[in-house]
From Swiss-Prot:
GO terms for molecular function: hydrolase activity; protein dimerization activity. Its EC number is 3.1.3.-. Induction: During exponential phase and in conditions antithetical to sporulation. Aspartyl-phosphate phosphatase which specifically dephosphorylates the sporulation transcription factor Spo0A-P and negatively regulates the sporulation initiation pathway in order to control the proper timing of sporulation. The lineage of its organism: Bacteria, Bacillati, Bacillota, Bacilli, Bacillales. Keywords: Hydrolase, Sporulation. GO terms for biological process: regulation of sporulation; sporulation resulting in formation of a cellular spore. Pfam families: SpoOE-like (PF09388). PANTHER family: ASPARTYL-PHOSPHATE PHOSPHATASE YISI. The gene is yisI. This is Aspartyl-phosphate phosphatase YisI. Belongs to the spo0E family. InterPro entries: HLH_DNA-bd_sf, Spo0E-like, Spo0E-like_phosphatase, Spo0E-like_sf. It is an enzyme of class 3 (hydrolase).
Length: 56
């Protein structure tokens, strides 16, 4: 997951440099990165809860 996030982050930067910050291409990349980051956060929260429950 980390490599996908890093790849999308680089793509976002390159897209913003090429098309501008407010272009539809940049916004699309930003939204895709948001999805990856939100998924990562949810996974960490679920995994963290699993670890807490397994210690009981």
């Amino acid at each position: 997951m980390n490599s996908k996030i890093e790849e999308m982050r680089i793509t976002l930067i390159e897209t913003a440099q090429k098309y501008g910050m407010n272009s539809k291409e940049t916004i699309q990349c930003s939204q895709e990165l948001d999805i990856l980051l939100n998924t990562r956060i949810k996974e960490e929260m679920i995994f963290g809860r699993y670890l807490e429950n397994s210690r009981m």
